[in-house]
Amino acid sequence: MPRVDPNLRNRARRPRARRGGGGGVGSNSSRHSGKCRRQRRALSTPPLTFLATTTTTTMMGVASTDDDSLLLKTPDELDKHSGSPQTILTLTDKHDIRQPRVHRGTYHLIQLHLDLRPEELRDPFQILLSTPLQLGEANGESQTAPATSQEEETAASHEPEKKKEKEEKKEEEDEDDRNDDRERGILCVVSNEDSDVRPAFSLFPARPGCHILRSVIDQQLTRMAIVRLSLNLFALRIITPLLKRLPLRRKAAHHTALHDCLALHLPELTFEPTLDINNVTENAASVADTAESTDADLTPTLTVRVRHALCWHRVEGGISGPRGLTSRISARLSETTAKTLGPSVFGRLELDPNESPPDLTLSSLTLYQDGILRFNVTCDRTEAPADPVAFRLRLRRETVRRPFFSDAPLPYFVPPRSGAADEGLEVRVPYELTLKNSHTLRIYRRFYGPYLGVFVPHNRQGLKMPVTVWLPRSWLELTVLVSDENGATFPRDALLGRLYFISSKHTLNRGCLSAMTHQVKSTLHSRSTSHSPSQQQLSVLGASIALEDLLPMRLASPETEPQDCKLTENTTEKTSPVTLAMVCGDL
């Protein structure tokens, strides 16, 4: 079995470089750094230019806690000696400008380790992957065998039928599910714990193109002989929360400043077949008509029909919900109806295209102890809509496999614009805010589900905000650090950052759940579990994720033929290069 280059292994365990322009770091490290300098001087290219296309790759299997077992292996050797897929790809500054090597494979983690001179960080440079990169399917890896010509012809003949069935299914689903692709992948770049350079914690959509990774350079680094840049690149599973449906909240007493604009009679409680939105296989009417249908197959559904002239009140938005014109409607339910609804009930609006404002949203939904159902509908406009207003409120018991909010996400959380490259919700300030000192912003929304919310700030001049992990069943609290003596002002609807919901399996540890973007570190470690005696995990921001629970990343050679890089619906759209470029600046 081939052994790793001893110089490379010594460098992996090297101590920190001593400060000073010519300070050594030990005999082995000094020889290695001198060798690197001689290699760089031998190249006739400008500084750092070779990094754009000549970053070489070295394959590495699952790391072990024993240093002697950290052997660099080729893909063939990994497949020969181990039946498990390749897990970690390690990129180092070992390179050959004349014959850059690009390896194919599927990995859960890509590590980059570069030893640079401080002066090499002055100019922007490309650091990672000039090769097609795509993500595996969120609900299963995309490593499938190539289809034969006969299979392709068969699939093509059935494609119109599948397309028609898919359109029929979409008609049965509500808007939340039509606009959602279920789990998707997003690339995450974070520095390793032994990195001297501090790149910002960054999330990038897995789309072709070059993404900018920004970093700060401490002045102390200029006095070091060798500066280490160490990065971890991996793909997180993300999922879009429910935005058009609200959970039915239950309260004992009614306290509100708004009066009921409309009081309805008792709606009829109907029973409808249970439909699995993730896998709709049968028509609802056909299921309801079958004699085999039982109470377990039927879901209680309450439909409140409204076609009436409503009175409207103006609200500014915030804790009470979205801003705009709001109308409150009530309906008294019988005790039997209220009990039959049971828990896990969600409500959504079904609009009439001719008599409903297109921007009408459900902003609150509450059932009180006295059996009165009250809900608010809101439209963001200055003038009241024309009368009458027609819509239906449908309450249904559902098993939700996505994050959902305690109240309407607006005006705090705004979905991305159609066609936007970024997948995260925009977090905005609902009103003008002026801060003189550092302040903690509390957003009065909770979310539910076995997920993690991650807030990535959009820092403005004169203030900074940390990357924050948002735990379920808690308010989202954001710390704003004001560095300008004159304070800082947030105009109305100012962008604070973006919010992502991580669906990768995770465990919480004692790490800090909040850190500035340039202070976020990641650690690769082993942990014993009931399923595996030594499971590789990656820890970042107080959460640990097993490598096998990360979305696999597939690398392909640039000369790969198009038919060998076919993509599924849940992968990137094109097999174009996904690259990262680093821009460094002073702290």
UniProtKB/Swiss-Prot annotation:
GO terms for cellular component: host cell cytoplasm; host cell nucleus; viral tegument. The lineage of its organism: Viruses, Duplodnaviria, Heunggongvirae, Peploviricota, Herviviricetes. A motif (Nuclear export signal 2 (NES 2)) lies at residues 360-367. Interacts with the DNA polymerase accessory subunit UL44. Interacts with HCMV major transcription-activating enzyme IE2. Interacts with host HNRNPK. Residues 1-48, 136-185 are annotated as: Disordered. This is Protein UL84. Keywords: Host cytoplasm, Host nucleus. It comes from the Viruses. Residues 155-169 have a biased composition (Basic and acidic residues). Coiled coil: none annotated. It comes from Human cytomegalovirus (strain Merlin). It is found in: Host nucleus; Host cytoplasm. Residues 10-19, 32-41 have a biased composition (Basic residues). Belongs to the HHV-5 UL84 protein family.
